[in-house]
Amino acid sequence: MAKVDLFNIKGENIGTVELKEEVFAIEPNQDVMWRYIDMQLTNSRAGTASTKTRGEVSGGGRKPWIQKHTGRARQGSIRAPHWRHGGVAHGPKPRVYFKRLNKKMKRLALKSALSLRLKENNLVVVDDIKFEKPRTKDLREVLKNLGLENQKVLIVLPKKESEYENVKISGRNIPGVKVLIADNPGVDRVNIDGLNVYDILNHDKLVLLQGTVQKIEEVLG
C-alpha cells in the first residue's frame, strides 16, 4: 500500500492515508493516456462547422463573359472558389466526431494518470472540505493553507450533495481551479463533471478528499 500525508483545511498534517497500489502506484502508460485524451477531446467537438460549395452559394447562373476575344482569362462562373464571394473548395461540413475506447483501457488510463500525479508528488489528500454556503474567499483560504495558491489545481469531491456543491460553486471564480465530482468517473462514459484523464493531467496539483479516495478505489480497484 502506498502512503501519503493527510491534511486538514488548515494545512495541518493530521496523519497518513494508505492508497491501493493497483490504483495509485502502477507504472503510468503514456500511450493509453494519450488515447483516452484523444477520445475525450474528439467526442467533445460539436461538429457544426459548415461552408457552402460553389453549388450552394447564390448567383453565378451565367457565364461572366464570352470565352474568347476579351483578353482576359476564361471564366465559367462568378461563384467558383477562386472568385470573391465564391464557394469554398473542400471546406468543412457538419459531421459527427466520435471515438471509442474499451472500459479496460479507460480504467488503465485513469489509474495511470493518478499514479503519475502521486509519483510526481503532486497529489494532495485532505480529510474533508465542506462549506455551509458558497464563498470564493473560503476556498482561496483552504488552497493558501495547503500551499496551492496561484497554481492550477484540480479538486475532486466524492459525491453530489449541497455542502460539496457549495465547494464546487466557490471554485468557479478562481483562475486555474476546477472542481469535479468522483461520482461519475470517466469509465463507463466521459462525463463533463466526472473525474477524467484530461483534467488530471491539465492541472499541476490534484486534491482528493478521503471520501474521494474511497470512491475511486471502489470503482477502479
Curated annotation (Swiss-Prot):
Keywords assigned: Ribonucleoprotein, Ribosomal protein, RNA-binding, rRNA-binding
First and last residue of the signal peptide: none
Record-annotated membrane-spanning stretches: none
Source species, domain of life: Bacteria
Keyword Ion transport: no
GO biological process, one term: translation
UniProt entry tagged with the keyword RNA-binding: yes
InterPro entries tied to this protein: Ribosomal_uL4 (IPR002136), Ribosomal_uL4-like (IPR013005), Ribosomal_uL4_dom_sf (IPR023574)
GO molecular function: rRNA binding; structural constituent of ribosome
GO CC annotations, alphabetized: ribonucleoprotein complex; ribosome
Region span, Disordered: 47-77
Subunit-level organization: Part of the 50S ribosomal subunit.
Family: Belongs to the universal ribosomal protein uL4 family.
PANTHER family the UniProt entry points to: 50S RIBOSOMAL PROTEIN L4, LARGE RIBOSOMAL SUBUNIT PROTEIN UL4M
Protein role: One of the primary rRNA binding proteins, this protein initially binds near the 5'-end of the 23S rRNA. It is important during the early stages of 50S assembly. It makes multiple contacts with different domains of the 23S rRNA in the assembled 50S subunit and ribosome.
Protein name: Large ribosomal subunit protein uL4
Organism encoding this protein: Thermosipho melanesiensis (strain DSM 12029 / CIP 104789 / BI429)
Lineage: Bacteria, Thermotogati, Thermotogota, Thermotogae, Thermotogales
